[in-house]
Amino acid sequence: MNKKKKPFLGMPAPLGYVPGLGRGATGFTTRSDIGPARDANDPVDDRHAPPGKRTVGDQMKKSQAADDDDEDLNDTNYDEFNGYAGSLFSSGPYEKDDEEADAIYAALDKRMDERRKERREQREKEEIEKYRMERPKIQQQFSDLKRKLAEVTEEEWLSIPEVGDARNKRQRNPRYEKLTPVPDSFFAKHLQTGENHTSVDPRQTQFGGLNTPYPGGLNTPYPGGMTPGLMTPGTGELDMRKIGQARNTLMDMRLSQVSDSVSGQTVVDPKGYLTDLNSMIPTHGGDINDIKKARLLLKSVRETNPHHPPAWIASARLEEVTGKLQVARNLIMKGTEMCPKSEDVWLEAARLQPGDTAKAVVAQAVRHLPQSVRIYIRAAELETDIRAKKRVLRKALEHVPNSVRLWKAAVELEEPEDARIMLSRAVECCPTSVELWLALARLETYENARKVLNKARENIPTDRHIWITAAKLEEANGNTQMVEKIIDRAITSLRANGVEINREQWIQDAEECDKAGSVATCQAVMRAVIGIGIEEEDRKHTWMEDADSCVAHNALECARAIYAYALQVFPSKKSVWLRAAYFEKNHGTRESLEALLQRAVAHCPKAEVLWLMGAKSKWLAGDVPAARSILALAFQANPNSEEIWLAAVKLESENNEYERARRLLAKARSSAPTARVFMKSVKLEWVLGNLVAAQELCEEALKHYEDFPKLWMMKGQIEEQEELVEKAREAYNQGLKKCPHSTPLWLLLSRLEEKVGQLTRARAILEKSRLKNPKNPGLWLESVRLEYRAGLKNIASTLMAKALQECPNSGVLWSEAIFLEARPQRKTKSVDALKKCEHDPHVLLAVAKLFWSERKITKAREWFHRTVKIDSDLGDAWAFFYKFELQHGTEEQREEVRRRCENAEPRHGELWCATSKDIANWQRKIGEILVLVAARIKNTF
């Protein structure tokens, strides 16, 4: 039997084996195996199946859906580049080679993922941080407000109302459950009458009384109320006021007992009891848990390393901050035992202890550290008596005689004579201290001071301050010729001793000398070091910057010395002479300016501006003949110079020498016939009332200079003055044909048409001007104002919007736009204007006017100052500033504005030019024009 048994019996069939397939046998199924056919609506055998699985049809649908889910080959799941999104072979068998391929792909993916992992994570981190910055969490947005909750007091917390829940309030809180306490007046009235009332007056129920019997027993006998005493008639009334007084008396008795106690430091001041309690509240802002952690950590540090001074100091300060001062003192005293050689621990102990105890601590510290300067200084600070301080410091100097700090502290307490004696000993003990040598030199006489400084130079040959002090000493005693030698010798000696000459440090020393009044020393230092370490081609630029820096530091003599040295090196540079002249004009005297200008024109005779500055200085001083002689010399050096001709004409006309001015202009027209010369000729005749001569000169000038717009303007204005509207219109039109880009000509023609009532024509002229001159703020501004003056505010606002689109950076337009808005919107408009034109004077002036209109006087004055500082040439800003000070300032403030305006000599501004160029005001000074313009301003903005 065993021999016939096949070896494969009982073994598992190989993979893919089908029984009988080798001999051609195939499996089949008969209907009897399946059973009779069933309808789709027939129930299945499982009668407990859930809905959707109870019929044969449901089972078929489910199996069909499962087959469909195997492979989703719909067009929506197909991509032209990647193919089907799902796996096409997901329904196939998953074999070993598939598993191996998946493992290889997974390894590749992992390898590729690790290649740039750090860079990718860094980028993702930065993106997340950027996202969090742009869109912070609500928690982060309110973090600063949450910090402020620490400032809320307990009373404010208690006063915060409960939020509650308003939903279903009627159902949750029915009216019959509301209890109302009986007022004291009810009991008082009841006791007075001595009667038992078991009902309430209807009027009391009407005004918040009881509609139902009180649950506590008002209709029934009150618990304890019917016993003899409270409800007994005539037993007296319940006085709440006396109960309160008794309670206060009891509190006073207790506080008196405590205050009378002398058994220790528990004596309490009854009046300051609550104040003392408030002062005992810890002032730290940390969390209690954080303090506990810090205390444990510091305790661990102290135990592991008890000889580490910072651990004891930190522990004491932690306890001090938390309000446990005695614990802090105990800790730091323990620290002095463990670290007796630590200065910091002893000083901290002295700081924490009260006065007398601190002195004892310092005395103990001195025994352990007899060479500690800081402890001696602290000991002197603890003494209140000057004699005691001196005694402590002298004792300290016996132990530490080479301490400069101790010598300085001791000298400060002495009288001058004693200080001199002490300093003579100090320089012996500390021969390398420059401060002690200089202090001794200041206290000595002139001869002794020279000896002291010589000794100081021998002991400290590398310090520049000794040399500078020696120079100042010689200057103070009138020996100015030695100052230059000392400074030169100082530079030589310091270089010989290997000291690098630091130019910036020497300039700072010179500025200090200037502020101390040592002018000669300051100038000598500047001359000695100004050229050190500078390339030859950079000298002029660097020196001008140095001069500006000195002026900014208010070291005027230093700046004057720099200019003098620069003029020696560059005697023919007009720009240097000009800078020096402007410096003398702003910070010097008239005499120094004129002396400088005389030297300037001698070196630069072709510089017209220097001649003109000299002539103007003489004219302003009232010396007209000297001004004439300067201009005569200027004519010799600059023949046919237009500027000098016109300056001479102005000089004569301002001094009412009209015939001389006419002759000068006639000569100028023949020798230097320029457009400006003709214009000044017309202007002179016009202001003198000779309109016929002015027109003739104007016609003659236009034959030669027809493209000069000011001549056409003057011709039209003269015609307007004579009320010849047609001729004026013709003059303006002819001028615009020759000068189509002249904005003032367009404005004059438009205003002429508006003046005669031709609003439509004026509007058309401005539209035409804007077409020929695009992006011109002045034309847009006039168009807006034209509509506003006509009462068409909506059209004016629309035009302003278009103007700001075309000229978004025009300060003139933005300043006008602010006041076109209604009052509530003006502040928003001003913010927009400042964003676009932050440094435009017109916008700053508009903001100042806005604050003025809101009666914010301080802010308005600040913005006026900003405006005139940014552009001092804007006359309108000065006029508004002066008007503001007339209404809200003092006499000194008004005079200050007027003085600054006269120094600035403004030439621009709409209101300013309209007044200053008026024929009636042609001889007015700057201050007079300022008053006239301010009078024209109506602060109705």
UniProtKB/Swiss-Prot annotation:
It holds the Pfam family TPR_19. GO terms for biological process: mRNA splicing, via spliceosome; spliceosomal tri-snRNP complex assembly. One of its GO terms (cellular component) is catalytic step 2 spliceosome. It comes from the Eukaryota. HAT repeats lie at residues 384-416, 418-444, 445-476, 554-586, 588-620, 622-654, 689-721, 723-755, 855-887. Identified in the spliceosome B complex. Identified in the spliceosome C complex. Associates with the U5 snRNP particle. Component of the U4/U6-U5 tri-snRNP complex composed of the U4, U6 and U5 snRNAs and at least PRPF3, PRPF4, PRPF6, PRPF8, PRPF31, SNRNP200, TXNL4A, SNRNP40, DDX23, CD2BP2, PPIH, SNU13, EFTUD2, SART1 and USP39, LSm proteins LSm2-8 and Sm proteins. Interacts with ARAF1. Interacts with AR and NR3C1, but not ESR1, independently of the presence of hormones. Interacts with USH1G. This is Pre-mRNA-processing factor 6. It comes from Bos taurus (Bovine). The gene is PRPF6.
